[in-house]
Amino acid sequence: YEAKFEEKLLEAKKMGATTVIYGDIDIELHRQWDIDRATNAGLDYELPLWQGDREKVVHEFIDAGFKAVIKKVNLENMSEDFLGKTLDKPLIEEIKKTGSDACGENGEYHTFVVDGPLFSTPIELDVLGKTISNGYGILDVK
């Protein structure tokens, strides 16, 4: 995974990218992984959310107009029923009721951002189904 990630960073660098922006908040192991990948690819890096309040971060993301769809859930924490749902404040409350972190920072869930103020057009996801694999529920999309 690391090699493939760095390969994609090198491709982005060839296209003119100079900096990698990461969304990690406060897990040092993740921060170091981010730094290592960027450094190995010869790119600068920024972690603008680093040391932010997790719940505040996710609320600011939603308030800013970003739309993210839950793409993967850890079935130890959350049910596959969360797959395909768009992150909003009521859903954050549902997520917290499962005992999961509001941001999913501990790997409870992962999202795919499909729209927001930086997008010229939203990304349309064609949902093909759901897969259960190795303790995770995964939304299959095209």
Model-inferred region functions:
Residues 1-142:
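Nucleotide-activated chemistry modules centered on ATP-dependent adenylation/adenylyltransferase
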